[in-house]
């Protein structure tokens, strides 16, 4: 019995040692792993090459796959040199990789190693990381020096670059551009999307110069069309248009919509004469517009839109864009000057006018709940040909764009700004622009459809010449127009949802 008792303290001591050892193992082993430095994969492109060791050949083999730049890895502090190149062994998601030591950085701001980017798709340069303010415009082929960036996307691409360059006017500019329009080399920037460029490059209105521009100067790269989970787009719209006065009878129009299968409403935010309501955000931009709205109460207008939303109706806010008598009165410097016409018309080249309309669009979408903004009169005046032919017109063309370029560039700007808010963007166009030429007023159906979420053409009977019998026998004419529009849709990689306007007013 006494011998047994002598072993008890020994056993207790052994057990205590084992417990202490186990505790130390649990406590200190993870700390050792955590003590290893965490680094980030860096590159001048979205992917970082990695290597694995071929034991038979006693060398590193490059994988055909890439790791995404910006990925966090654990530096295992095991370096290996081969052919004068230093490699580090890193761990990521439980796997070990050989990575070039030069591809590891400590600071997330050092993840991007490119110092310059080139413009593939002409792009708006923004004053700030966020916001609508326009600093300048970068043209296809321009080289931009990188100053910084905002955020890394999941695929390693950059959302926005902060850049510095000298623009086409000679202005020294520091601003922000969307990374999706940039490429790493000048060769890639100057390249065109050949499959679609070849279709459009010879498009011309017979031998006559319309001064609308050449399709060769337009962008034909695919544009990713968003889908917002909290705001699904209306794919098959049966819509009704309500001008500003109709808001007063909104209950009657909702009842009419329910009775006739209408699932969407296009509601005026601004027509060519006035705002629907006093929008605070544009008060300083156009005092005349702010002080002379159709309805004095913003709340009254908002409540009418809300009734439509509550009824399950998809609400599209309409903005007359480049035909605006009130903005023109406040900003004559943004308007076209010409001896051909006495009508005051803001120029589609004017970034001041772009900005004003997008401030209004984003504010109305946020305040009233519009799910989509539809821009009408996204063009130059009908007299644009005569203005250009006269030779004395000042179109305020600061960046030396062709008319069709300006229209497409506005669409890029507007779509980007609205998409940031989860709002869709659509444009109204003349039926004529579905023809295989760029119109004198700058509209070319495929160039617009490529960019926007929905496109609404207006093949109205009264838009045709008097030689065509559009009122008593419209079907052949409308069929021919629809055939052309369908062809234009097939000539681009990312066509918009087509929603054609139908005339519902009395025949003459």
PLM regions with names:
Residues 228-245, 303-306, 316-363:
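Active-site-adjacent "subsite" loops/lids of carbohydrate-active enzymes
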């Amino acid at each position: 019995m006494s011998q047994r008792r002598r072993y008890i303290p020994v056993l207790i001591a052994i057990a205590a040692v084992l417990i202490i050892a186990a505790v130390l193992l649990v406590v200190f082993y993870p700390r050792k792993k955590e003590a290893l430095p965490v680094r980030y994969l860096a590159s001048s492109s979205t992917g970082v090459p990695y290597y694995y060791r071929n034991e038979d050949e006693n060398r590193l083999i490059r994988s055909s796959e890439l790791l995404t730049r910006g990925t966090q890895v654990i530096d295992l502090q095991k370096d290996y040199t081969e052919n004068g190149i230093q490699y580090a062994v890193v761990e990521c998601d439980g796997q070990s990789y050989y990575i070039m030591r030069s591809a590891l950085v400590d600071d997330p701001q050092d993840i991007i190693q490119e110092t310059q980017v080139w413009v593939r798709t002409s792009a708006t340069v923004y004053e700030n990381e966020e916001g609508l303010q326009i600093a300048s415009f970068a043209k296809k082929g321009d080289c931009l020096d990188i100053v910084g960036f905002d955020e890394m996307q999941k695929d390693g691409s950059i959302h926005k670059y902060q850049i510095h360059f000298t623009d086409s006017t000679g202005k020294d500019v520091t601003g922000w551009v969307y990374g999706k329009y940039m490429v790493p080399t000048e060769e890639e920037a100057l390249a065109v999307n050949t499959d679609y460029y070849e279709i459009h490059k010879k498009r011309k209105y017979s031998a006559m110069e319309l001064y609308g521009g050449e399709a060769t100067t337009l962008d034909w790269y695919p544009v990713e069309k968003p889908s917002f989970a909290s705001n699904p787009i209306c794919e098959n719209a049966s819509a009704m248009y309500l001008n500003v006065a109709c808001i007063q009878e909104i209950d009657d129009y909702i009842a009419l919509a329910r009775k006739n299968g209408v699932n969407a409403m296009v509601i005026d935010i601004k027509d060519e004469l006035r705002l629907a309501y006093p929008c605070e955000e544009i008060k300083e931009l156009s005092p005349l517009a702010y002080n002379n709205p159709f309805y004095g109460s913003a709340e009254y207008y908002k409540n009418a839109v809300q009734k439509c939303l509550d009824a399950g109706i998809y609400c599209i806010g309409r903005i007359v864009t480049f035909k605006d008598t009130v903005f023109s009165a406040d900003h004559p410097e943004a308007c076209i000057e010409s001896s051909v016409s006495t009508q005051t018309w803001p120029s589609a080249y004017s970034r001041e006018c772009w900005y004003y309309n997008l401030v209004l669009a984003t504010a109305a979408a946020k305040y009233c709940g519009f799910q989509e903004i539809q821009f009408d009169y996204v063009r130059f005046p009908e007299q644009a040909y005569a203005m250009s032919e006269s030779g004395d017109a000042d179109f305020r063309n600061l960046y030396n764009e062709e008319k069709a370029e300006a229209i497409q560039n506005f669409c890029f700007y507007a779509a980007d700004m609205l998409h940031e808010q989860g709002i869709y963007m659509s444009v109204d166009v003349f039926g004529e622009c579905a023809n295989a030429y760029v119109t004198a007023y700058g509209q070319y159906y495929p160039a617009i459809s490529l960019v926007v979420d929905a496109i609404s053409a207006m093949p109205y009977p009264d838009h045709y010449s008097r030689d065509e019998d559009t009122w008593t026998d419209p079907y052949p004419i409308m069929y021919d127009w629809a055939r052309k529009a369908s062809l234009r849709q097939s000539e681009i990689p990312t066509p918009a949802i087509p929603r054609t306007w139908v005339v519902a007013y009395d025949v003459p």
